[in-house]
Amino acid sequence: MSDCVLIQNLKVATVIGVLDWEREVRQELLLDLNLEWDQQKAASTDDVGYCLDYAAVSQWVISHLGGAQYHLIETAAEEIAQGLMKEFALLSIEVTVKKPGAIPEAEWVGVSIRRERR
C-alpha cells in the first residue's frame, strides 16, 4: 500500500542544539511528514470521518516538540516518528526535520528517517 498524507514545512519552535546559547532560546524547525495510511474507505465513501486528521497530527507535533528540549534533531525526529506511529496507528512514516540557519553556508541542515510498523 502506498496511500500517504503529506505535511510539508510544518513550523515548530523548540529548544534545540548543543551549544550553550542554543539551550537558552527557542529555534524554529521545519518538518516534512509522509504518513502512510489506508485511505481507501475515505476515498470510496467521500466521508471525512475516515480520513487521517492532518490538523490533529500537526497539533500533536507542535505540542510535543514545543514542550520539549533536545540536543539533537535526530532525537526529535525519532520521537516524532515513534509518537505519531503510536498515536495515529500509521503503517509507516517518514519524518524530515530541518534546522534553518544551523550553518551560514546552507539554507538548512536536517535529518530524514523512515519507520514502519512491524
Placement of each model-derived feature along the sequence:
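N-terminal, polar/charged subdomain of small-to-medium soluble alpha/beta proteins
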Residues: M1-R118
